[in-house]
Regions:
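Phosphate-binding site of ATP-dependent enzymes
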Residues: 197-276
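Residues at the C-termini of beta-strands that transition into short coil/loop
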Residues: 40-42, 129, 157-160, 197, ...
Length: 276
């Protein structure tokens, strides 16, 4: 059996979404091949080994259980191997893990920080590496790389907390005027994202985004098609791609996946997509 450390929860605003994702991953694991080792991370960033009822993961009730604290110890050499340790009865003991599967969303999970920690500790992990994770989490960096590669994308300007009113107005002009989208530069799941049609909405949008990140992306409003495609593999073992899906958005004009009760209320998912 392969012991898979499933990391879930986390410190970001997408904590609850991570719980839902972890619940899906746990259910999908082949129990004949993989043994899940559940590592829950609370909103304060503390790590715990959870061994209770799996149903309590998605609800968040796992935190009410008596969980053993977990730490990561650096070391990747054969004679100085690092990894996971759990605190049991006042003593640290090794938590046997063959590979880690981070099922974390947002900052502290998808931004390369956890990936870097796992690499320093010599723990193999599933998913993007440090650089790809960091670049994909930062909208400014991803826009710049796309532009450098010749990929067309909306105009994107960056503001930092404390920017002057003149700077705030200037980036709107650089994006072609209203409407614009305002986003935490390193957030996800549309949390803190607003569409601003005028100066009043723009002020509120900036306040909402700056409450979540000191760096904010202001983007040109475009009419396009939103598509998604899962990619599995790497340059060594080859790459497999799934079907391309298409998200058709109605109503307020963008996909609000973070809505808890009905995240798809304003959307229609087509798979495969109906692209020409």
């Amino acid at each position: 059996m392969i012991n898979v450390a499933i990391l879930f929860g986390g410190i970001s605003t997408e904590h609850d979404i991570s719980l839902k994702s972890a619940d899906n991953v746990i259910a999908a694991l082949d129990s004949k091949r993989f043994c899940p080792v559940l590592i829950g991370i609370d909103r304060n960033g503390s790590w715990f080994h959870y061994t209770g009822d799996l149903a309590d993961v998605v609800t968040g009730a796992w935190e009410e259980h008596d969980c053993a604290p977990v730490v990561l110890i650096p070391g990747s050499a054969p004679d100085a191997r690092g990894g996971f340790l759990e605190l049991v009865d006042g003593e640290f003991r090794e938590l046997e893990v063959d590979v880690a599967l981070p099922v974390l969303h947002g900052q502290g999970g998808e931004d390369g920080t956890v990936q870097g920690a796992l690499e320093v500790c010599g723990v193999p992990y599933v998913g993007c590496g440090v650089l790809a994770s960091a670049v994909c989490m930062d909208k400014d960096a991803s826009h710049r790389l796309a532009a450098a590669a010749g990929v067309r994308s909306p105009k994107c300007e960056v503001l930092y907390r404390g920017a002057t009113a003149e700077d705030e107005a200037a980036v709107v002009e650089k994006c072609g005027g209203y409407p614009v989208f305002v986003k935490p530069a390193r957030g996800g799941s549309s949390i803190g994202v607003s569409k601003a049609n005028d100066a009043d909405e723009y002020r509120k949008a900036l306040d909402a985004a700056f409450a979540l990140d000191e760096k904010v992306a202001v983007e040109e409003n475009i009419t396009g098609v939103e598509v998604g495609c899962a990619v599995v593999g790497d340059a060594v073992h080859g790459v497999r791609m799934g079907e391309v899906d298409e998200i058709v958005v109605h109503g307020d004009g963008f996909f609000r996946i973070h809505l808890e009760k009905d995240p798809g209320a304003n959307t229609e998912l087509r798979c495969p997509s109906e692209l020409p």
